[in-house]
């Protein structure tokens, strides 16, 4: 009898224990499980200015995506699963400023992670090499004063490069010009840098042409963001006008004094002729190279270093002494009459503060050595190269979708 009671007692406690164990086991199965963790091997990348490719390992128990790329920072894949390697390629930074991109890795579930890419700025200025095309307009193909020999054009750019890379004062603007080798469709040019075009007239007004919105005139110009266009024809304006040029545009987020806002032109074409116009009467002269270098200065954002009359004007550069051009020309005539056209005094100017200096600046007119730029002019040219939407080469630009909507389409300024 005692044995029977003990057996029943053991059975009772066995049932209780099993119930407790089952309850504990069931609780573990019902409890929410933590989401698998996303692991990124590198959260901060610091590529060098020359550009670099970084290898990042992403670990996750499931699928994930990576986004936030820019035109200069790109992963080799946008999605993956489980453990995978992503190659993040960072292009060369040609600008002096540090730039930052933040990539976001999003898991299928759980918290996302970030990869900050912080690239150092360039240690020296990027060398801009700008292709130049001369559009030679002619009515009579046999007339050598209209359809000019290509040898005249080949000699112009070396003079320009000497001025822009190695001026009299040793200042290097970091820009070179070369004869374009291919047209916009990628076809090799029979004559490098020369595009010969039968035209409706042997001469025309340079001012009317360079401000024209006529479809035929605009179609003549190759894409300004890829070429420097120089259109060569005989001007109907009076003698003494060798060339004129459009001025570049600036940007709203980094404006430059004297230039118009061209944000809209990052996303749409310019609706007028945009070029340098060169008078055929002057392009065959010995000083034509310096004339082109002067007009390229306008094309890259520089103004004249003088005032046209008594009213003080500015070129927005503090290191270029200003002078009264009209008063100088009167004095020059007196010097020529008394001492002849070779007098060294013709190269002297009297600034608006009374200082006397020798004219060497590329943005002056005769009589001048025209063989140097100043540090402030250098800053303006670099600004235009790095920001202007209608200049060849890489620019620092915002997203076109953000800057084109609602902006006006201003015409270009014209300089001679």
Q: What are these regions, as identified by a protein language model?
A:
Residues 59-87:
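Surface-exposed binding patches on compact interaction domains or structured appendages
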Residues 274-372:
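The catalytic-center signature of Zn2+-dependent metalloproteases
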């Amino acid at each position: 009898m005692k044995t029977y009671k003990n057996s029943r007692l053991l059975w009772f406690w066995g049932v209780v224990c099993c119930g407790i164990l089952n309850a504990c086991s069931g609780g573990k199965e019902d409890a929410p499980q933590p989401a698998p963790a996303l692991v990124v091997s590198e959260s901060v990348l610091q590529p060098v200015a020359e550009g670099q490719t970084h290898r990042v390992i992403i670990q996750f128990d499931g699928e994930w995506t990576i986004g936030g790329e820019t035109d200069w920072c790109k992963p080799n894949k946008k999605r993956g699963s489980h453990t995978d390697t992503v190659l993040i390629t960072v292009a060369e930074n040609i600008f002096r400023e540090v730039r930052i991109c933040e990539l976001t890795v999003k898991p299928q579930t759980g918290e996302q992670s970030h990869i900050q890419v912080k690239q150092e700025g360039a240690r020296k200025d990027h060398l801009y090499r700008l292709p130049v095309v001369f559009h030679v307009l002619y009515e009579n193909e046999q007339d050598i004063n209209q359809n000019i020999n290509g040898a005249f054009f080949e000699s112009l750019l070396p003079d320009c490069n000497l001025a822009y890379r190695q001026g009299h004062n040793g200042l290097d603007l970091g820009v070179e010009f070369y004869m374009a080798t291919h047209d916009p469709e990628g076809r090799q040019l029979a004559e490098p840098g020369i595009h010969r075009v039968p035209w409706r007239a042997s001469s025309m007004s340079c001012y009317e042409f360079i401000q024209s919105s006529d479809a035929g005139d605009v179609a003549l110009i190759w894409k300004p963001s890829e070429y420097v266009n120089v259109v060569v024809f005989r001007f109907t304006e009076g003698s003494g006008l060798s060339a004129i040029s459009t001025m570049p545009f600036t940007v709203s987020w980094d404006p430059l004094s004297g230039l118009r806002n061209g944000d809209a032109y990052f996303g749409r074409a310019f609706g007028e002729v945009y070029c340098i116009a060169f008078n055929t009467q002057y392009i065959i002269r010995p000083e034509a190279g310096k004339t082109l270098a002067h007009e390229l200065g306008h094309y890259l954002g520089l103004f004249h270093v003088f005032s046209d009359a008594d009213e003080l004007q500015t070129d927005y550069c503090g290191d270029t002494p200003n002078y009264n051009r009209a008063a100088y020309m009167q004095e020059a005539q007196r010097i020529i009459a008394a001492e002849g056209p070779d007098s060294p005094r013709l190269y002297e100017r009297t600034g608006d503060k009374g200082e006397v200096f020798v004219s060497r600046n590329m943005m002056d007119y005769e009589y001048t050595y025209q063989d140097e730029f100043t540090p402030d002019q250098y800053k303006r040219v670099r600004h235009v190269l790095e920001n202007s939407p209608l200049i060849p080469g890489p620019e620092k630009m915002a997203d076109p979708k953000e800057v084109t909507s609602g902006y006006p389409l201003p015409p270009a300024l014209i300089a001679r």
